[in-house]
Regions:
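Short, flexible coil/linker elements and helix-boundary hinge sites characteristic
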Residues: 31-32, 76, 109-115, 150-157
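Juxtamembrane/interfacial segments around transmembrane helices
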Residues: 62-70, 91-99, 139-151
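Short membrane-interface loop/juxtamembrane segments of multi-pass integral membrane proteins
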Residues: 67-88
Length: 158
């Protein structure tokens, strides 16, 4: 079973801080002229921190899972399935942070009651979820094919 390392926890905390920074920056931009400049810099900083922490967490996870043998591939697929909901949550929050930036810049104050950023981030997350699920189903299909090849080679040997 795959366990998170302390590095992943640190990047998860950085990720939450990045998204929090981006959303607070958006509210600073709306609040007024004095805080708008601070908010303008907080939003991209939060988005960059969020994306870097997600990429680092995925990289740490991929290095921790062995994929050299069939058993390693099986463990990798199982742990990737476990990480799927975390990656979807990460994608949701990153998309929300990115759309917060677009909302703050493109949407005027007259229509700020409707949160366009949430709608767009939902669409982005659905697209990302479809790609992630397709990737997981392809890995599961490859695992079944590898197991079948292994059983056939064992039959041929004996």
């Amino acid at each position: 079973m795959y366990r998170c390392s302390w590095k992943e926890y640190i990047f998860a905390v950085l990720f939450i801080l990045g998204v929090f920074s981006a959303n607070i920056g958006y509210h600073f931009m709306i609040a007024g002229e004095d805080l708008a400049l601070i908010g303008f810099f907080m939003i991209p900083a939060g988005i960059i921190i969020s994306f870097v922490s997600v990429l680092a967490r995925i990289r740490i996870h991929d290095q921790a899972v062995p994929v050299t043998q069939l058993e390693g591939i099986r463990k990798g697929i199982v742990s990737s399935m476990g990480m799927l909901h975390l990656n979807l949550l990460s994608a949701l929050l990153c998309a929300n942070a990115a759309m917060t930036l677009l909302t703050g810049i493109l949407v005027s104050k007259a229509i700020e009651n409707y949160n366009w950023g949430s709608t767009l981030s939902f669409v982005v997350v659905v697209i990302i979820a479809v790609f992630l699920l397709q990737d997981q189903s392809m890995k599961a299909h490859d695992l079944k094919r590898l197991e079948k090849m292994q059983t056939e080679s064992e039959k041929n040997v004996s």
